[in-house]
Curated annotation (Swiss-Prot):
It comes from Daboia siamensis (Eastern Russel's viper). It comes from the Eukaryota. The active site is at H67, D112, S206. Keywords: Blood coagulation cascade activating toxin, Disulfide bond, Glycoprotein, Hemostasis impairing toxin, Hydrolase, Protease, Secreted, Serine protease, Signal, Toxin. This is Factor V activator RVV-V gamma.
Amino acid sequence: MVLIKVLANLLVLQLSYAQKSSELVVGGDECNINEHPFLVALYTSASSTIHCAGALINREWVLTAAHCDRRNIRIKLGMHSKNIRNEDEQIRVPRGKYFCLNTKFPNGLDKDIMLIRLRRPVTYSTHIAPVSLPSRSRGVGSRCRIMGWGKISTTEDTYPDVPHCTNIFIVKHKWCEPLYPWVPADSRTLCAGILKGGRDTCHGDSGGPLICNGEMHGIVAGGSEPCGQHLKPAVYTKVFDYNNWIQSIIAGNRTVTCPP
């Protein structure tokens, strides 16, 4: 694979995400204000609307989905309520963006990962702290947590003032393969959700973290429409498979290749 630093937005990639262009947590409740210091909100200078989420992994780097890229993107850290500001909230802009170019599957949707270097490092505080990258892969049955400011209703365009959280489980990949043609069996993705339905990421949650045992194991990539349907779990980029790529980019190695 070839590593490229993309300065233009990924228009084709974005248009391909009809299922969950940006997602929110359906079937969840308001997150505890202190449980998501790593959660960031992505928006643009032209709009205050949150179109995606992401996660802070150190003072200078944020991990999110490639299809969340926009021109003039802004990253807000330390936020809980959209309307009541935390004293330690900070806003940053990108210094650089890094992607994996997918040559095996032209639409690139099975490598939905973007690493953003911030123009200025953040200051850690009560509501701003990094999440750990995965130390090992998590298997089927692992309980994980999803969170975001995304849509909370499957029938109405209802978006919360505060992030919502809920627990889901990693399920067998076979549940996702027939639902999403861009998720082949050998893709580096996780399939996760509640098979009976009712709990899911949704529009506005894309790019946000899948947290398992305190580590970021997934990035919200895509799913069904409407969200939270019976036997229709969602797809998450498998962060563990990109650990070496992420650490190499952070260390300054711009020639590192993405996992095949």
